[in-house]
């Protein structure tokens, strides 16, 4: 299904916001030159700060997009981080009339400034499945060509899927317009300014925004997570065949294990021999609640490379790099990961590194919230749906260097509802969506990806990744039976008999009843859950008081 251009979408053009009208006018200016991905590559090579490595672009991708046969991976290196910060966001529809008028004027002024520069634009399709395709246009300056080039790499250039897109039924939603202007100057204190003025202007109702909001507007659940589908029908041992096809999804910020759980080839050798696996995506997808299916937005991965040394096999899938060191090795310019130059080095990688991948997959059997909360056992199952969604809506985690935050913020526990820092709409809409996921039969779990209280919040019992991967397999294969976690009604932990059969020593090691300094542990447990309750009480869930009450009451610690 395809989005609509403005003349199609607005039966009354007066319903269009001034923000979209300004964006549309710029987009349709004859002085804005349309470029394809090959032209964007050539422009990006000449951009200040961009270096060409001797690492070839993944050949299959280069061939598909008609890039030069000898195309190389470009490394776009920046100075201080001034973008990617929530403080820069201004939500047009959240402002009062006076503030809207001011912002409209400032936006017109910024676009006028922008038109003093040579401008380029490109079109892409967001969404990999014929039933979820949005057209998007990105407009920027020629001096920002690498940004546009990387955007085309991350999604699908429009011409690649033009025929399929044009043949699709129309969605009740507008095309997306994005505008970037790095040379913007403004000293108005209304806007964030750290070395340079920053404005991320969001008009979510008129699709001057990213794709997450589009999905929620048409009744889907937006997921900042990874999801894979396992087919047990191909297992060598026939006892697994009855499990059929099962999908499992993981939600967490960078560094919580989301990609490790999604992309691991065989869950550290714990999946039964002969299984078949496909991955939808390790970072972003939508759950179509009407058709009970999951759909991908992007054909590529935007990954951290801090754990990928020079000889890592993933480098062959590289398409573009950001903020990587480059060394001369055997006469060639070789990019180096492992955050050698600065933290949060990133790579755009072809989905081929996932092995078998798909554009849509089965509705999830299980959803897992990945928590950085030391008072939680390694795994809990939420049998109360309101507890399940409350834990997602008040997902507790730690900030990381993938985000533009101060150093002292990195170790603080924070709430990031459903692990989605890109949400620009009301929280209650995500809550409603995930309650619907629960009503459609999905099971919900919490994994502790930090470590479990041993003696204090600083002295923790480690939870190795292999242990968590083994637990994942146990969930998928119904190996666990459950008993109530006495501290939290509606939550369950594995029984001794079932968990010891697959992870000997687990029950005693992680038994909530045997935590050191037990009184302090209980005090901290109650405090963390009170923080969750306070967070939900202070959120826009107050617009849905009945739902808010049910979620908050589910978080009562005994």
Each model region followed by its residue ranges:
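Extreme N-terminal, non-catalytic leader segments
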Residues: 168-245
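Conserved nucleotide-sensing/catalytic segment adjacent to the nucleotide-binding pocket
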Residues: 273-347
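A structural signal for short, well-ordered beta-strand segments and their strand-loop junctions
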Residues: 118-125, 249, 280-281, 367-369, ...
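Long, basic/Gly/Ser/Thr-rich N-terminal segments
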Residues: 2-203
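Glycine-rich phosphate-binding P-loop
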Residues: 236-271
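Secondary-structure transition/capping motifs at alpha-helix termini
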Residues: 217, 235, 268-279, 437-442
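Conserved, well-ordered active-site substructure
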Residues: 247-249, 291-308, 458-478
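Conserved NTP phosphate-binding and transfer environment spanning the P-loop NTPase/kinase superfamily
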Residues: 2-69, 329-558
């Amino acid at each position: 299904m395809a989005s609509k251009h403005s003349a199609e979408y607005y039966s009354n053009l007066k319903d269009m916001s001034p923000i979209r009208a300004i964006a549309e006018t710029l987009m349709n200016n004859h002085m804005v030159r349309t470029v394809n991905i090959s032209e964007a590559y050539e422009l990006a090579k000449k951009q200040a700060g961009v270096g060409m490595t001797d690492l070839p672009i993944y050949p299959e991708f280069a061939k598909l997009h008609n890039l030069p046969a000898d195309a190389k991976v470009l490394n776009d290196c920046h100075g201080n981080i001034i973008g990617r910060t929530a403080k820069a966001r201004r939500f047009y529809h959240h402002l009062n009339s006076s503030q809207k008028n001011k912002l409209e004027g400032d936006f017109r002024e910024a676009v006028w400034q922008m038109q003093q520069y040579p401008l380029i634009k490109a079109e892409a399709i967001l969404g990999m499945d014929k039933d979820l395709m949005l057209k998007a246009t990105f407009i920027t300056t020629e001096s920002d060509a690498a940004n546009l080039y990387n955007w085309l790499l991350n999604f699908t250039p429009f011409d690649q899927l033009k025929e399929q897109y044009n043949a699709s039924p129309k969605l009740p939603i507008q095309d997306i317009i994005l505008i970037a202007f790095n040379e913007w100057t403004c000293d108005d204190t209304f806007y964030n300014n750290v070395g340079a003025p920053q404005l991320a202007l969001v008009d979510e109702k008129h699709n001057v925004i990213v794709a997450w909001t589009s999905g929620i507007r048409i009744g889907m659940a937006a997921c900042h997570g990874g999801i894979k589908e396992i087919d047990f029908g191909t297992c060598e041992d026939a006892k697994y065949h009855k499990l059929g096809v099962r999908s499992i999804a993981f939600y967490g910020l960078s560094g919580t294990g989301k990609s490790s759980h999604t992309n691991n080839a065989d869950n550290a050798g714990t999946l039964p021999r002969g299984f078949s696996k496909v991955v939808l995506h390790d970072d972003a997808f939508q759950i179509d609640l009407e058709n009970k299916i999951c759909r991908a937005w992007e054909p590529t991965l935007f990954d951290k490379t801090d754990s990928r040394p020079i000889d890592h096999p993933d480098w062959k899938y590289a398409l573009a790099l950001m903020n990587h060191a480059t060394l001369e090795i055997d006469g060639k310019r070789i990019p180096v990961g492992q955050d050698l130059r600065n933290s949060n080095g990133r790579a755009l990688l072809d989905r081929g590194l996932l092995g078998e991948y798909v554009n849509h997959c089965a509705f999830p059997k299980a959803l897992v919230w990945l928590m950085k909360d030391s008072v939680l056992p390694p795994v809990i199952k939420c049998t109360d749906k309101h507890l399940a969604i409350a834990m997602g809506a008040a997902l507790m985690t730690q900030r990381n260097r993938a985000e533009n935050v101060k150093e002292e913020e990195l170790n603080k526990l924070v709430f990031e509802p459903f692990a989605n820092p890109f949400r620009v709409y009301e929280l209650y809409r995500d809550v409603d969506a995930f309650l619907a996921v629960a009503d459609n039969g999905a099971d919900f779990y919490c994994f502790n990806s930090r470590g479990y209280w041993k003696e204090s919040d600083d002295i923790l019992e480690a939870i190795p990744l292999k242990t968590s991967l083994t637990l994942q397999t146990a969930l998928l294969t119904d190996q666990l039976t459950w008993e109530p976690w006495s501290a939290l009604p509606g939550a369950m932990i594995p029984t001794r008999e079932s968990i010891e059969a697959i992870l000997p020593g687990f029950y005693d090691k992680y038994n909530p009843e045997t935590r050191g300094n037990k009184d302090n542990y209980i005090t901290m447990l109650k405090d963390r859950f009170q923080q969750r309750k306070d967070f939900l009480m202070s959120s826009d869930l107050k617009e849905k008081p009945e739902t808010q009450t049910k979620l908050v009451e589910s978080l009562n610690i005994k």
